[in-house]
Every structure is written in structure tokens, then in C-alpha cells.
């Protein structure tokens, strides 16, 4: 479970683009790795895992600042497991993909709409819809203001569709804002979306049209959170 320790919490994202034939193997080695972390009581490491429908797995780790990237939090695990066992796990990981990478995103509390409290832990709502709003530098501030106007309309109307807004950072090519919506499943997401569109009415349609006119590119992705592939250190 990831807690939000500050207003604009940053996250280190590690993405593994897993081969279609290797996804079961990848999940098994991920579970074996978590079992080792639990067995040896690895400290100072917490991450959540999401799976995008295209087979990309995201390991999501909260960080306080860029200096956190220099910390080798796995060093105690290496020492307790021994080099051979430790390296064998990551060798198994590497056999599951040809491409992987890292980047930073920051959760923006001012733009996110969760009236009952900003949290990533949406229990019973592991379905995810990611809306990527790519923008050029010349339109970045205008897009931010438009997202804020949409949030304000949601609040005024008492919308039941909640969203979190992230902003791209270090390690990404181009700039984007990312709206993340949680739901029980795809059907629940679609139903809530239809209800929300009706609630916001013409005012909502106008704001979204104005927002889309500012974008350089838009894309959406679907997937699920995988609590069984995440890890929380014991306190």
C-alpha cells in the first residue's frame, strides 16, 4: 500500500514490456522476488504494480526526491540471499522482456479530483483507465488551467467519477498530463462515464472540447492494478 506523503508526490516508474509468451513466467518470478523480500524482511522498499493490457508491467515506487534514485535499497537483500540466488532472480526477469525503462511522474493534488481524500488505494477498484494528454510547451500552462476548470466543474456538480492527475517528469520524451480513473471493472467504468457525461451536460462538453484543442496528442490505455505483485515493507 502506497501512502501519499506530500501534496505533490513523485513516483519512480519502472516499465517492463513483457513478451506475450513470457507473461506467466514474469508474474511467477515477480512473486518469487516478493517472497524473498518478505522472507528476509527487506526494509525501505514499497511498490505497487500495474499491468497494462498491452503486456507492459509498471512497478510504481514513491520517492521524496531525485536523491532517492541513488539509494540501493536492495543491497540488504543481496547480502542475505547471496549473490548467486539474487542474480538468478534478475536473470529470470531479463528473459521475459527485451525492452524496459524508467521515468518519473508527479501526482498533482491541485488538479486531482477525489473529494473524499486523495489516495492511490482504491479498494475494490483495481481496473484502471489511463488518459495521456500530450502537450507542447507553448500550451502547457493553458492545459493546466483547463484541467483545473474541469476539476472545478466536477466539484460543483458533485461528480462521482474521481480522477488523479499526474505530470510527466525526468526520463520522458515530451510533456504530458495523465488522468487516471479507477473502477471495479470495464463495465463499471463505462457506466460511470456515461452518468458523468450526462451530469456535466453542455458545460462539460465545452470544457473537454477546449481541453482537447490544446493537445498535441491523446491516447488512452486500460489495465489493472496487481496487488499480488506489489510489496510493502513491514514497519
Where does each model-flagged region fall?
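Short S/T/G/P-rich N-terminal loop/turn motif that feeds into the first structured element of a domain
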Residues: 2-205, 209-235
Amino acid at each position: 500500500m502506497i501512502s501519499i506523503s506530500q501534496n505533490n508526490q513523485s513516483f519512480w516508474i519502472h516499465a517492463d514490456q513483457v513478451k506475450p509468451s513470457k507473461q506467466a513466467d514474469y508474474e511467477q518470478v515477480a512473486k518469487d522476488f516478493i517472497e524473498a523480500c518478505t522472507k528476509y524482511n527487506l526494509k525501505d522498499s514499497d511498490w505497487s504494480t500495474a499491468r497494462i493490457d498491452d503486456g507492459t508491467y509498471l512497478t510504481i515506487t514513491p520517492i521524496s526526491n531525485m536523491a532517492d534514485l541513488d539509494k540501493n535499497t536492495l543491497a540488504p537483500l543481496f547480502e542475505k540471499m547471496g549473490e548467486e540466488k539474487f542474480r538468478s532472480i534478475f536473470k529470470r526477469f531479463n528473459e521475459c522482456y527485451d525492452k524496459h525503462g524508467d521515468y518519473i511522474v508527479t501526482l498533482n493534488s491541485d488538479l486531482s479530483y477525489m473529494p473524499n481524500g486523495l489516495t492511490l488505494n482504491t479498494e475494490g477498484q483495481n481496473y484502471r483507465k489511463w488518459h495521456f494528454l500530450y502537450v507542447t510547451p507553448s500550451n502547457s500552462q493553458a492545459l493546466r488551467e483547463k484541467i483545473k476548470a474541469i476539476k472545478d466543474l466536477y466539484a460543483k456538480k458533485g461528480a462521482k467519477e474521481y480522477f488523479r492527475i499526474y505530470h510527466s517528469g525526468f526520463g520522458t520524451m515530451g510533456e504530458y498530463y495523465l488522468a487516471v480513473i479507477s473502477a471495479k471493472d470495464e463495465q463499471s467504468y463505462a457506466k460511470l462515464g456515461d452518468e458523468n457525461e450526462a451530469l456535466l451536460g453542455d458545460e462539460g462538453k465545452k470544457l473537454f472540447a477546449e481541453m482537447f484543442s490544446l493537445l498535441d496528442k491523446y491516447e488512452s490505455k486500460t489495465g489493472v492494478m496487481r496487488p499480488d505483485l506489489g510489496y510493502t515493507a513491514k514497519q
